[in-house]
């Protein structure tokens, strides 16, 4: 039985506070703080051949965020237990070969952590190089604040959701968000990198971007290979003068930008990064 048949005709499961339940079973009350206030965090993880990719970076970010929010992770909410439950759920949902997993952690009434794990099959195309390149623009209707919460993957995700809808309406692939200084901080579902004169530029965390897992992984990998990576303030002028522009996240890895408005980019360095750094994470062999 194919996973396509399995998905279409039901039978999917989730994990709620360590307990396997049917995906369509109600699990939250109207008093849930994540539902009412966005009082929680989430991680979007990629599972490949039964392994949770970049798991240590995901859980480091998650537990750091819970500490900041004052949400207590009890003994049954640990990185090792969550990782094991993610793997079990992927197996149960028949998507351990390649899956998108969402782990949502929210504040219970006693300030302890409650959580939900969802796992669905991921199309193999998500592993591949985006040959045609993406198009991008700036989302004009929101500004992110540059506070300590800006770097979190918060369930209060409204500016990003609105930016994704705006991109769909405009027929473009991604929208970039500005901070309250009118500088670029990140994309609606990505972090942004620019390549200019053999240097890599990305918005610093103090600029309000999400502390992306693939962003961190790639910066370390580039530095280990001797490249200069500059975390700085990124304005539209730098975007216009750069030779290459690409986006990163944990699911798609890397996506090169073909155009930003009238600006056209090349992808020579970006494709090399994909082949040498990103693809080996997910692919046993390369085309």
Regions found by a protein language model. Give the residues of each.
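Short secondary-structure junctions
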Residues: 90-99, 226-227
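Ordered, amphipathic secondary-structure segments that act as subunit-interaction surfaces
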Residues: 95-105, 112
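Helix-start/capping segments and mature chain N-termini
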Residues: 5-88, 106-108, 112-287
